[in-house]
Amino acid sequence: MDIPEGEEDPTFDFQVILVGFSKGCVVLNQIIYELSTVSAGVDPPLNDFASRISAMYWLDGGHSGESNTWITDEKFLDHLAKHVPRIRVHVTPYQIKDATRPWIGKEQKKFVENLRSLGANVKVKVHFQDRDPSLAFHFKLLESF
């Protein structure tokens, strides 16, 4: 947004809530990598944006790759844990109990464990946990979160 010189950005104090669903959680992961540079102070606009993030929601994160669906490296999770007040993880059996992609459930569990060990305010909800993994319930999560 182009703001005339001398005028205040009207969005400056807006809170930012980031939500990723399924493969869209890759974008949240990239933001985590970028946020790790905030403490270095090398990018003032990124610092301003990062300071306004009030919550991040992962909704049934997953992709077709064979690893790195969830970030588990504490080096990157540390900034997230310290600077994002609310971290929420909503998952279904479609992602965390898929026998053909067992790493997703393991990585998700490690992601949450590492954030908790770093002091993050993270909460997890497993939706449809009494159901078999199903693409239908994967999308139904969007109605129930």
Ranges and model annotations:
Residues 88-145:
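C-terminal catalytic histidine-bearing segment of alpha/beta-hydrolase fold enzymes
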Residues 2-85, 96-99:
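Serine-dependent carboxylesterase/thioesterase catalytic core
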Residues 1, 23-27, 104-107, 134:
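Phosphate/oxyanion-binding active-site loops and adjacent basic polyanion-contact surfaces
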